[in-house]
Regions:
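C-terminal motif of bacterial Sec signal peptides marking the signal peptidase cleavage site
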Residues: 20-23
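Bacterial signal peptide processing site
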Residues: 25-28
Length: 629
């Protein structure tokens, strides 16, 4: 599968023939080859060179029950560690990932990352699918030799998580069409939207670090060529996006190219050189020149090339369509839903749960509105913030002590959003890099977008949200896999739950009706957006139908105002689903535990949840029951 983009949380949260642009051979190939397949009006025609599922696989097909193996005790643990190490080396195989994820990658066995091919491979060509599938089948078979019942503690949790993920990978690599359903260069969330910011994250402790960084810059040429080739191959197979989407992608590269002469990375590079102890003036001068040369003669020319290649694809005559309009799209969505939501629930089960949650919110909002109006004054004047990001972090760190478990001693530092990103970046974000060092935590701050509810944003990103969870997980397991390969649905579900929970700390009166109404407001937009995401990909909702649905639920949007987000949801399936359903399933686990264990305190429930690590929500709930009983 392709690495859609490297998430700035950096715990997430991924050699083909290069096609020349010297002529029009690429476009001729795209337009000349007919897209075979079903032409009954039900599906968009796509190539029969690819393989497609003939049905939607059930959970039991992907995750069948297994008999216990024969390896017990220390032999079982050794086998688990062996498989984990093998998978980590397979997943973290490039310099960029290794350098960002770990301060000392060699200590976790990552020694094969070459800075000359720093970004690794952007995609997995269909021809490599059998090899990938065989790799994961071998790891599964090795795991199944373990007698699961003899494992204890985080070994048992790691076994559950790794086996689940391995079986998902086996299914994922069973059908080559799965590689091509989605666009890489999405204009809103594609890798080009954050590449400059990501480059600013690299730190230099030694001369070699700076020299390797320049190799990272030079490798952008090869890496982005791979992604362009992917888009061209995707169009060749009949999955071309709309001319509007390709133009929007090209425009993002145009915007990058405008920074060629005064990009913030020039100054940032020089400032990072200041951190290298004993750097000679001659080496400093050389590195500055090499950095500028790589930026102006490799990076920005590559972005110009990408813009040209995306505009060329406009002639392929594609369209933006939901997954339900493609052969095998329903099976792909089912797999994607499990992966992104961190749950084994089906798409239908997820939609049913989501619709019920939306109905419940609607009823609760109506009931609150009919109550005494005293709370409305608090709601209208609320200010859920203590000031700056530091003031909010200091306040929350103390306020949450009675409800959330301790995390290890650690440090964090603040990083201002570069001015070029201020208009589009959220008020704050957590960046956990060098996950083998508790002191490597960054809170990225965008002072331009700070609002009166900044405190709950800080709760989402810091305490008790992303930073708190990351620190706790890393300090409560010896299995690196559990914090490197955690699902986005798990992480965002926890952080959004914490965002809502933390409103009570700012109200001055604890959990009030006004606080609850603010929580409903928070949930409302997220869950409706999630429902639209499902509607597009399961029921083929058009732009008009999405706008109609949102307006029927009081959102007051127009076709023109929603068009950009509609395109995002069509071209990036499950974009909102991973956030919305991650939150729904997290809250569902918490509510179930409070119902089943009414004497348990929130501290006990939150601790049991975090102690269950980054397993699926079903696995987490099972483990919590054993802990809380």
């Amino acid at each position: 599968m392709k690495k859609l983009f490297r998430k700035l949380t950096c715990a997430l949260l991924l050699a083909s023939l290069m096609l020349s642009l010297s002529g029009c051979s690429v476009l001729k190939e795209i337009l000349a080859e007919p897209t075979e397949g079903r032409n009954d009006g039900k599906y968009i025609k796509t190539s029969n060179e690819l393989t497609y599922p003939d049905h939607v696989a059930s959970y039991d097909e992907v995750h069948p029950k297994h008999k216990p193996g024969n390896l017990k005790g220390s032999d079982a643990v050794a086998r688990l560690n062996e498989v984990e190490s093998t998978i980590l080396k397979h997943v973290i195989s490039c310099y960029v990932d290794a350098d960002i994820l770990f301060e000392n990658p060699e200590k976790v066995g990552i020694t094969n990352a070459d800075p000359k091919t720093a970004w690794g491979d952007a995609t997995t060509p269909a021809s490599k699918y059998p090899e990938k599938k065989a790799f994961y089948e071998k790891q599964r078979d090795l795991l199944l030799e373990i007698d699961y019942e003899t494992l204890t503690g985080d070994d048992r949790l790691a076994f559950d998580k790794i086996l689940y993920d391995v079986e998902e990978e086996i299914y994922c690599y069973s059908y080559t069409a799965f590689e091509y359903y989605t666009m890489i260069f999405n204009s809103l969330v594609g890798p080009q939207s954050e590449v400059l910011f990501l480059l600013d994250v690299f730190t230099f402790d030694t001369l070699k670090d700076a020299e390797n960084y320049i190799l990272v810059l030079k490798d952008i040429d090869r890496y982005y060529d791979q992604m362009c080739e992917y888009e061209e191959t995707r169009a060749k197979y009949g999955f071309a996006s709309s001319p509007e989407s390709y133009e929007a992608a090209a425009a993002t590269f145009d915007d990058l190219c405008k920074q060629k002469d005064d990009c913030f990375l020039y100054q940032s590079f020089e400032e990072r050189l200041d951190k290298i102890k004993g750097l000679s003036s001659s080496d400093r001068e050389r590195l500055i020149k090499e950095n500028e040369d790589a930026m102006k003669n490799v990076v920005f020319p590559e972005f110009e090339e990408c813009a040209k290649r995306m505009r060329k694809l406009k002639e392929a005559g594609g369209q933006d369509a939901g997954l339900s309009e493609y052969r095998g799209g329903d099976a792909y969505l089912e797999m994607l839903n499990r992966n992104q939501t961190n749950s084994g629930k089906t798409v239908d089960e997820s939609i049913k749960k989501l619709d019920q949650e939306i109905t419940n919110l609607q009823k609760e909002r109506s009931q609150l509105s009919k109550r005494s109006s005293e709370w409305k004054s608090e709601y209208n004047s609320h200010r859920y913030s203590k000031g700056t990001v530091t003031q909010n972090l200091d306040y929350l760190r103390d306020a949450i002590k009675k409800d959330f478990p301790k995390v290890p001693a650690h440090e964090y530092y603040l990083m201002d959003v570069p001015k070029v990103f201020e208009s589009s970046f959220s008020p704050a974000a957590y960046l956990g890099f060098h996950l083998d060092n508790f002191d490597s935590n960054v809170i990225i701050v965008n002072n331009r977008n700070v609002d009166s509810d900044f405190g709950v944003t800080v709760a989402h990103e810091g305490y008790p949200g992303h930073m708190h969870q990351s620190l706790y997980t890393r300090s409560h397991t010896k299995h690196v896999y559990m914090y490197v390969c955690g699902s986005t649905g798990y992480k965002e579900g926890w952080a959004t739950y914490c965002e809502n929970y933390s409103m009570r700390y700012f109200s001055g009166n604890g959990m009030t009706d006004a606080v609850r109404y603010c929580q409903i407001d928070n949930d409302w937009t997220l869950l409706l957006s999630t429902r639209v995401d499902y509607g597009i990909h399961t029921e083929g909702w058009t732009l008009e139908e999405c706008v109609s649905y949102l307006n029927a639920h009081g959102m007051f949007v127009t076709k023109s105002s929603f068009k950009r987000f509609y395109t995002l949801l069509v071209t990036d399936p499950c974009y909102y689903v991973k956030y919305g359903m991650g939150y729904v399933w997290t809250s569902n686990v918490m509510n179930n535990m409070r119902t089943q264990f009414p004497k348990a305190t929130d501290m006990q429930i939150h601790t049991a949840y975090l102690d269950s690590l980054t397993c699926t929500f079903e696995q987490i709930e099972d483990n919590m029951k054993k802990t809380l009983k």
